[in-house]
C-alpha cells in the first residue's frame, strides 16, 4: 500500500466539473434521496415519453428486482446520434485508427447517422425486430459501433463476442441467447496478423445446428471466405441496397439493450443483461464527470468493444455526450512499443484510458519509447481492468503524464455497467493504487466473512448496499443464477466478489478477487498485494501470484515473475525477491516458490488467466480447461516445463 498522496492542484479543481466540496454535497444528495437525485440526472438523456417513476429496486432474498425510469420511453441510438445532428452534425464522432499506422478514418455524427440507419434497414429487411438478439463478432472497426447502434435503433438486443474467442466459445454464446443474425468480417487484423473471423462463424454455426438465418460480412482484409447463398451477404452490398433513413424504435427504459457474456467462477459463461434507460444515463454521466469530458476533447479508451469497457466508454457513454471517441484496432507494441504515444500525438488525444497490464508491459521497454514522443495534448489518464500496483501508477503518472495529468483509477465490473469507485480529477486527492471514493449514488460497504458491516478503517469483502441505474438486471434466461451469484452470499446486498481495504480517509483499495485470496497459516493474503510488492522491485516487470497446496501452511505462495529486458534469472535474484517481499509486506507474505517466466498467460484483452497459473502451481496442468482465449499459447508450455512444484524430481 503506497503512503504517497497527490493533492489536487488548484488548476484541476477550477477547470473540472466538480471540486471536493461539490463532490461531498452531490454524493450526500445522491445517497440520501436517490429518487430526487436520479430524477434530476435522468434528464441528461432525451426521452420520447418522460419517466414519472425513478427507482423501483429490491435486493431482498427471493425478490431481487431492479428497475429504473421504468415508465420512460427513449432510444439509445437516438441519444447517441440523432440528438447531436443539429448542433454538431459535422463534428467527428469516431476517429478510427487501424492496425497499421497508415490507416485511419474520421466519421462525423452525420456520417455516423447515415451508416447506422443503413445497417438498421439491412437488419430490418432480414426480419430483425424489437427484442431479437443479434451477435456481433467483429474486429475493432467502425462497423462494430455501427452494428451496436443499428441494433439499438431497432430495439434489438446485441451480444458482442470478442473477436479473439474460439468457434466453441462463439457457438455457446450464440446458442444461449438464440441469435438469428451474426455480423462479422472476413478476417480481423491484430498486430499484423490475420484472424479468421468468418471461418470461425461458419464453424460455430455448424456446431449449433442452425438457428442462424443471416450472416452479414464486412470486407476488412478482402481475404477469400466461404459465402453460403441465401444466408451470407457482404455488408457493403447489403447497405448499398437501402436508404439511410430509419425511424428510431420507441423503447421502454427497461427493455434490454445488450447481453455481454462474462466468465463465471463455475459453469458456462453468464449472459449479463443490461437495459436501456438507466444504463445510458449512468454511462453518460460517469463518462462526463470521471473523465472530466468537455466539448472538443479527444477521448481514447484503448479497450475492445468485445468487453464492457468498450461498450460503456468507447461507444455509449462518449457518443451520448456528443464526444469524439477514438477506436483503435491495433495493439500497444505494433509496429513499435511507441504506438500508443504515437497515436496520442497523431490525433492530439486529451483523455487516455487503458489497462494496468498494458502500462506494465510498456514499462518493461523503458522510458525512451515514451519520451521520444510529445504527448503534450494529454490532460487526464485513466486505468481500468484490475487494481493498478503503485509502481505502475507512479510510472504512468511520471513518465506518460509528466506529472501534470491526474490519474483516475477506476473500479467497476461487467455487471455494474459503469464505474462505481473512482477519483474525480478536480475533487479527489490521489493515492497510487487506490480507487479512492464512490461515484454518486454508489453505496459501498466492507463486510466480514459473516456479513457484519465494518466501520472505519478495515479490510473485508466489498458489497454494494443499494442499486444504481447502470446495474445489470439479470443473467439472461436465468434469474435464479443472478440471485444466487450476486445476492445470496450477503443477503440484501450486491456482492462484488472482490476483497477491499478502506483506509482512515475512507478511500477504497481493491485487494483482488476473493478467489484470488491465499490463506497462509490462517492469515488471509490478497494476491494483488504480493504482486504489487514484487513489481516494485526494479528488476521485475510483471508478477502473478497464486496459492498452491502446502503441507504445513495449508496454502503456500507461488509467484510467477517476468523480469525487465536484459535482466537474468538467477538463484541470487530469487532469494533477493523473497527477502524483498518479506520487507515490503512481512514474513507471512514470503513467496514459497518463484518461477521466472518470459511471459504470463493472458487473454487477448490483456487479462492474466490466473486459473491456468493456479492449475500449473498445483501440478494439475493436464486439466487446464478452455485455453482458446489465450493470446500466446506458447507461454503455457514454458510455464509447465519450468514449473517449481513438480510431484517428483523426474517429472
Curated annotation (Swiss-Prot):
<feature type="binding site">
    <location>
        <position position="537"/>
    </location>
    <ligand>
        <name>Mg(2+)</name>
    </ligand>
</feature>
<dbReference type="GO" id="GO:0016208">
    <property type="term" value="F:AMP binding"/>
</dbReference>
<dbReference type="GO" id="GO:0005524">
    <property type="term" value="F:ATP binding"/>
</dbReference>
<feature type="binding site">
    <location>
        <begin position="385"/>
        <end position="387"/>
    </location>
    <ligand>
        <name>ATP</name>
    </ligand>
</feature>
<dbReference type="InterPro" id="IPR000873">
    <property type="entry name" value="AMP-dep_synth/lig_dom"/>
</dbReference>
<dbReference type="InterPro" id="IPR032387">
    <property type="entry name" value="ACAS_N"/>
</dbReference>
<protein>
    <recommendedName>
        <fullName>Acetyl-coenzyme A synthetase</fullName>
        <ecNumber>6.2.1.1</ecNumber>
    </recommendedName>
</protein>
<keyword id="KW-0547">Nucleotide-binding</keyword>
<feature type="binding site">
    <location>
        <position position="309"/>
    </location>
    <ligand>
        <name>CoA</name>
    </ligand>
</feature>
<dbReference type="InterPro" id="IPR045851">
    <property type="entry name" value="AMP-bd_C_sf"/>
</dbReference>
<comment type="function">
    <text>Catalyzes the conversion of acetate into acetyl-CoA (AcCoA), an essential intermediate at the junction of anabolic and catabolic pathways. AcsA undergoes a two-step reaction. In the first half reaction, AcsA combines acetate with ATP to form acetyl-adenylate (AcAMP) intermediate. In the second half reaction, it can then transfer the acetyl group from AcAMP to the sulfhydryl group of CoA, forming the product AcCoA.</text>
</comment>
<feature type="modified residue" description="N6-acetyllysine">
    <location>
        <position position="607"/>
    </location>
</feature>
<dbReference type="InterPro" id="IPR020845">
    <property type="entry name" value="AMP-binding_CS"/>
</dbReference>
<dbReference type="GO" id="GO:0003987">
    <property type="term" value="F:acetate-CoA ligase activity"/>
</dbReference>
<dbReference type="GO" id="GO:0019427">
    <property type="term" value="P:acetyl-CoA biosynthetic process from acetate"/>
</dbReference>
<feature type="binding site">
    <location>
        <position position="513"/>
    </location>
    <ligand>
        <name>ATP</name>
    </ligand>
</feature>
<dbReference type="GO" id="GO:0046872">
    <property type="term" value="F:metal ion binding"/>
</dbReference>
<feature type="binding site">
    <location>
        <begin position="190"/>
        <end position="193"/>
    </location>
    <ligand>
        <name>CoA</name>
    </ligand>
</feature>
<feature type="binding site">
    <location>
        <position position="333"/>
    </location>
    <ligand>
        <name>CoA</name>
    </ligand>
</feature>
<dbReference type="InterPro" id="IPR011904">
    <property type="entry name" value="Ac_CoA_lig"/>
</dbReference>
<keyword id="KW-0436">Ligase</keyword>
<dbReference type="Pfam" id="PF13193">
    <property type="entry name" value="AMP-binding_C"/>
</dbReference>
<dbReference type="Pfam" id="PF16177">
    <property type="entry name" value="ACAS_N"/>
</dbReference>
<dbReference type="Pfam" id="PF00501">
    <property type="entry name" value="AMP-binding"/>
</dbReference>
<comment type="similarity">
    <text>Belongs to the ATP-dependent AMP-binding enzyme family.</text>
</comment>
<feature type="binding site">
    <location>
        <position position="582"/>
    </location>
    <ligand>
        <name>CoA</name>
    </ligand>
</feature>
<dbReference type="GO" id="GO:0005829">
    <property type="term" value="C:cytosol"/>
</dbReference>
<feature type="binding site">
    <location>
        <position position="521"/>
    </location>
    <ligand>
        <name>CoA</name>
    </ligand>
</feature>
<feature type="binding site">
    <location>
        <position position="524"/>
    </location>
    <ligand>
        <name>ATP</name>
    </ligand>
</feature>
<keyword id="KW-0007">Acetylation</keyword>
<keyword id="KW-0460">Magnesium</keyword>
<feature type="binding site">
    <location>
        <position position="535"/>
    </location>
    <ligand>
        <name>Mg(2+)</name>
    </ligand>
</feature>
<keyword id="KW-0479">Metal-binding</keyword>
<dbReference type="InterPro" id="IPR042099">
    <property type="entry name" value="ANL_N_sf"/>
</dbReference>
<feature type="binding site">
    <location>
        <position position="498"/>
    </location>
    <ligand>
        <name>ATP</name>
    </ligand>
</feature>
<feature type="binding site">
    <location>
        <begin position="409"/>
        <end position="414"/>
    </location>
    <ligand>
        <name>ATP</name>
    </ligand>
</feature>
<feature type="binding site">
    <location>
        <position position="540"/>
    </location>
    <ligand>
        <name>Mg(2+)</name>
    </ligand>
</feature>
<dbReference type="InterPro" id="IPR025110">
    <property type="entry name" value="AMP-bd_C"/>
</dbReference>
<keyword id="KW-0067">ATP-binding</keyword>
Amino acid at each position: 500500500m503506497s503512503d504517497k498522496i497527490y493533492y489536487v492542484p488548484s488548476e484541476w479543481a477550477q477547470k473540472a466539473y466538480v471540486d471536493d466540496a461539490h463532490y461531498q454535497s452531490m454524493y450526500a444528495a445522491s445517497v440520501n434521496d436517490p429518487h430526487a437525485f436520479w430524477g434530476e440526472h435522468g434528464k441528461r438523456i432525451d426521452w420520447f415519453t418522460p419517466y414519472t417513476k425513478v427507482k423501483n429496486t429490491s435486493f431482498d432474498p427471493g425478490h431481487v428486482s431492479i428497475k429504473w425510469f421504468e415508465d420512460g420511453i427513449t432510444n439509445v441510438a437516438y441519444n447517441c446520434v440523432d440528438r447531436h445532428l443539429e448542433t454538431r452534425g459535422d463534428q467527428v464522432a469516431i476517429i478510427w485508427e487501424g492496425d497499421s499506422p497508415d490507416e485511419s478514418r474520421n466519421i462525423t455524427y452525420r456520417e455516423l447517422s447515415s451508416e447506422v440507419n443503413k445497417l438498421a434497414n439491412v437488419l430490418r429487411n432480414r426480419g430483425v425486430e424489437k427484442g431479437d438478439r443479434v451477435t456481433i463478432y467483429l474486429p475493432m472497426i467502425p462497423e462494430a459501433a455501427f452494428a451496436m447502434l443499428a441494433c439499438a435503433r431497432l430495439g434489438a438486443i446485441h451480444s458482442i463476442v470478442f473477436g479473439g474467442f474460439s468457434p466453441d466459445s462463439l457457438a455457446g454464446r450464440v446458442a444461449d441467447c438464440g441469435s438469428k443474425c451474426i455480423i462479422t468480417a472476413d478476417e480481423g487484423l491484430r498486430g499484423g496478423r490475420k484472424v479468421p473471423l468468418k471461418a470461425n462463424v461458419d464453424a460455430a454455426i455448424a456446431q449449433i445446428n442452425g438457428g442462424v438465418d443471416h450472416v452479414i460480412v464486412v470486407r476488412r482484409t478482402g481475404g477469400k471466405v466461404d459465402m453460403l447463398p441465401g444466408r451470407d451477404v457482404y455488408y457493403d452490398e447489403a447497405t448499398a441496397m437501402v436508404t439511410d433513413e430509419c425511424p428510431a424504435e420507441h423503447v421502454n427504459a427497461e427493455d434490454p439493450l445488450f447481453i455481454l457474456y462474462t466468465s463465471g467462477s463455475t459453469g458456462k459463461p453468464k449472459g449479463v443483461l443490461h437495459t436501456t434507460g438507466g444504463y445510458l444515463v449512468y454511462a453518460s454521466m460517469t463518462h462526463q464527470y470521471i473523465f472530466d469530458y468537455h466539448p472538443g476533447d479527444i477521448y481514447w479508451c484503448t479497450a475492445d468493444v468485445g468487453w464492457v469497457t468498450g461498450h460503456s466508454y468507447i461507444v455509449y457513454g462518449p457518443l451520448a455526450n456528443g464526444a469524439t471517441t477514438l477506436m483503435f484496432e491495433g495493439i500497444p507494441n505494433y509496429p513499435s512499443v511507441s504506438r500508443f504515444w504515437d497515436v496520442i500525438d497523431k490525433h492530439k488525444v486529451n483523455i487516455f484510458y487503458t489497462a494496468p497490464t498494458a502500462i506494465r508491459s510498456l514499462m518493461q521497454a523503458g522510458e525512451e519509447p515514451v519520451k521520444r514522443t510529445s504527448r503534450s495534448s494529454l490532460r487526464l489518464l485513466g486505468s481500468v481492468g484490475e487494481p493498478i500496483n503503485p509502481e505502475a501508477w507512479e510510472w504512468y503518472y511520471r513518465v506518460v503524464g509528466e506529472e501534470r495529468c491526474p490519474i483516475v483509477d477506476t473500479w467497476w465490473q461487467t455487471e455494474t455497467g459503469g464505474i462505481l469507485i473512482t477519483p474525480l480529477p478536480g475533487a479527489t486527492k490521489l493515492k497510487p493504487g487506490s480507487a479512492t471514493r464512490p461515484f454518486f449514488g454508489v453505496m459501498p460497504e466492507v463486510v466480514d466473512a459473516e456479513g457484519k458491516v465494518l466501520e472505519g478503517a478495515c479490510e473485508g469483502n466489498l458489497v454494494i448496499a443499494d442499486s444504481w441505474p447502470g446495474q445489470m438486471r439479470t443473467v439472461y434466461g436465468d434469474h435464479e443464477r443472478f440471485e444466487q451469484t450476486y445476492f445470496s452470499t450477503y443477503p440484501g446486498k450486491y456482492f462484488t466478489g472482490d476483497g477491499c481495504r478502506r483506509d482512515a480517509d475512507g478511500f477504497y483499495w481493491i485487494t483482488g478477487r476473493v478467489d484470488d485470496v491465499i490463506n497462509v497459516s490462517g492469515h488471509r493474503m490478497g494476491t494483488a498485494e504480493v504482486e504489487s510488492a514484487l513489481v516494485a522491485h526494479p528488476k521485475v516487470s510483471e508478477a502473478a501470484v497464486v496459492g498452491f497446496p502446502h503441507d504445513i501452511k495449508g496454502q503456500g505462495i507461488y509467484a510467477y515473475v517476468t523480469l525487465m529486458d536484459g535482466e537474468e534469472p538467477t538463484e541470487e535474484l530469487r532469494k533477493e525477491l523473497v527477502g524483498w517481499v518479506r520487507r515490503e509486506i512481512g514474513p507471512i507474505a514470503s513467496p514459497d516458490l518463484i518461477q521466472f517466466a518470459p511471459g504470463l498467460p493472458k487473454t487477448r484483452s490483456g487479462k492474466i488467466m490466473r486459473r491456468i497459473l493456479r492449475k500449473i502451481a498445483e501440478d494439475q496442468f493436464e486439466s487446464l480447461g478452455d485455453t482458446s482465449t489465450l493470446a500466446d499459447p506458447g507461454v503455457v508450455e514454458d510455464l509447465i516445463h519450468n514449473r517449481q512444484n513438480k510431484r517428483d524430481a523426474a517429472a
